[in-house]
């Protein structure tokens, strides 16, 4: 199934704006929220085709929320790409073990992210 709807979960207004502009310009329908809690509320109304997940956020972090999504029958098939400044190999491995399909580090390179999205869809 091609990816059309993307949910961005990132507490940085700058990152949300950059990702929203980039993805909208490439024809994706984008919703951007600033916390895992806000994302959980958003998922009750409509399911995206992909989630871009920051790790370091107030409240529930991105690793925890990705794990929660991967265990829920309603959301377990939605691919998650971790999109974060946490760039250690141990962070990447931990993110993948929590259920993420891929992992990119900030500052995000547009072509790399678009390539990863294309590979999932």
Predicted regions and their residues:
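Charged docking surfaces used in two-component/phosphorelay signaling
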Residues: 17-25
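Active-site beta3 strand of CheY-like receiver
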Residues: 46-52
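Short hydrophobic/Thr-rich beta-strand motif most characteristic of the beta2 strand and flanking loop
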Residues: 27-34, 42
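C-terminal output helix
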Residues: 107-117
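Short, glycine/charged-rich "phosphate-handling" switch motifs in NTP-dependent
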Residues: 101
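Receiver (REC) domain active-site loop signature in two-component systems and cognate sites
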Residues: 57
């Amino acid at each position: 199934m091609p990816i059309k709807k993307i949910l961005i979960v990132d507490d940085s207004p700058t990152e949300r704006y950059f990702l929203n502009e980039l993805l909208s310009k490439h024809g994706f329908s984008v919703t951007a929220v600033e916390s895992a809690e806000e994302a959980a509320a958003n998922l009750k109304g409509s399911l995206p085709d992909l989630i871009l997940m920051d790790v370091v956020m107030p409240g529930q972090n991105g690793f925890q929320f990705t794990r929660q999504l991967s265990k829920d029958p309603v959301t377990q098939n939605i691919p998650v790409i971790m999109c974060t400044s946490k760039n250690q190999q141990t962070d990447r491995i931990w993110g993948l073990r929590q259920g993420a399909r891929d992992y990119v580090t900030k500052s995000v390179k547009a072509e790399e992210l678009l390539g990863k999205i294309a590979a999932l869809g």
